[in-house]
From Swiss-Prot:
Residues 9-30 have a biased composition (Polar residues). The keyword Transmembrane helix applies. Disruption phenotype: Blocks the secretion of fusaric acid and results in decreased resistance to fusaric acid. This is Efflux pump FUBT. One of its GO terms (molecular function) is transmembrane transporter activity. The gene is FUBT. It is a multi-pass membrane protein. InterPro entries: MFS, MFS_dom, MFS_trans_sf. Fusaric acid is phytotoxic to plants such as cotton and banana. It has been shown to induce programmed cell death in plants. In addition to a mild toxicity to animals, fusaric acid exhibits acanthamoebicidal, antioomycete, and antimycobacterial activities. Efflux pump involved in export of fusaric acid, a mycotoxin with low to moderate toxicity to animals and humans, but with high phytotoxic properties. Constitutes a self-protecting mechanism of the fungus against critical levels of FSA within the cell. It is found in: Cell membrane.
Amino acid sequence: MAIDPQPSSPSLSSETIANDTIGNDNNVNEPSVEPKTQENQHTVPPRLSRIYSQAHHISQSFIDQNYPGEGTTQAPYRINFLPDDTQNAQLLPRWKKWAFVLLQSLACLATTFASSAYSGGIKQVIRAFGISQEVATLGISLYVLGFTFGPLIWAPLSELYGRKKVFFFTFMVATAFSAGAAGAGSIASLLVLRFLTGSIGSAPLSNAPALIADMFDKSERGLAMCMFSGAPFLGPAIGPIAGGFLGEAAGWRWLHGLMAAFTGVTWIACTVFIPETYAPYILRKRAQHMSKLTGKVYISTLDADKPPSSAAHQLKNALTRPWLLLFKEPIVFITSIYISIIYGTMYMCFAAFPIVFQKGRGWSQGIGGLAFTGIVIGVVLSIISFAFEDKRYARAAQRRGAPMEPEDRLPPAIMGSLLIPIGLFWFAWTTFPSVHWIVPIIGTVFFAWGLVLVFMALLNYLIDSYVIFAASIMAANSALRSLFGAAFPLFTRQMYDGLGVQWASSIPAFLALACVPFPFLFYKYGRQIRMKCEYAAEAANVLQKMRSLHVTVTEDDAMNEAEEMWRARTHNSHASAAHSHGHRRSLSYTRSV
């Protein structure tokens, strides 16, 4: 059952980083597929065709195409998406794309909602198990600690097994663990289940942005990311509001039941409606099944020039590479520390607000949760602000007529860096019971507004600065900020008892104030700093190569090239030092003679 190879012309290519950097030139170096002529057409048996079409949602016309290659192991057929391929996520109708973004944002909301909703039932957990406040707070910290490890594992697995399979498995198990937590018989089992739920349920935190990248090109991606970016912050802010009332009225077990129901409904909705979107996985599976059906050898054009990568290799890179970049690149380290401080401050609020509003003002558990309304308003304001910022950036890029610099992403971070300490100091010194309760809550509006502005702007800055290393950079940033988010609530009570409400609330404000110069420095000197950073400089070289030669470079290729450049520079510097030392010895000997 042969499919004769025919000469081909360029056709529509799938979305890659190269598409983003090259622009709209999708017609370079991609094999095309053309309908077979009647005389050459070989028909796949109807039974096999039906099975293949039902299982993999492709039509007979796809199998009947001609592809470059000979169908052998040495020269396999190279397949790509058809121009009107229904499985190409880039070609989905706009309303479907936005519906899928909404569903994935809801999945992230469900995950982060559960991280803080637990705080609404902490008093009941303390009474039920006879434990201290600090031990009960571990339910928040261990859940957020799961965010450190989960995305490092689920992100590479989603590239091997597809976004849909990873989401289906992780959210199914997270729903089961969340339901199990509702029936926990001891504090140990509750805490273990909380950690496992956070680790396994954190898949959308890394896979949702990847799904957005699968569906949207660079010109539209900013608005989609803006919509998604609110979920990781709205969830923690809404959690105590709902959790406070439910925990007070029905107890902590019903509160965990609500988390399980929220996760379960989201799991069903996303599984039913969102298709697989990752192009390399779709084409890889399609090639495998066509090889089985026809007896010929097929390969995806996206995998044709790459060595096969095992799950163990990808997991090793995913677990080690982010830390390498974090500690070797000053830009990554400084921005990640800044984001981690303000992210940890947000989670510190879950331990601090009950002290300020319930203990200090005598509010009930349910009413105390409403204190987080200010954070909700601040997050909404930041999303609106970023929608306008996205339009400003697009207009500036159009006027310039040339690629924008990464530093052009920083104006929102400059504004946000000022709003954060203003909001935190405002909150800290208006928490006196004699001051109206609305005043400190207004301070949290400015804090949350600035928090999301800084978060989004600095992440965009890192992505634009490191391009091909973006996945590892995001993993490093996510891991570090999750560690801070897990740690901050654990020492909050002791800090407030020792320093008092006002000075304890001022500590994160002083930390944020110390970080204010960073966005300004990066805006003014960022380019010079980047060119002195090993991997940032290599990313710039790769970006230039992709723009000029219209080639796609993988993260592994770029990492290897960067390491080779570093070894070459090290060797040259050692050789130069040895030569200089030898020259000095020669001069010394000449003088002595």
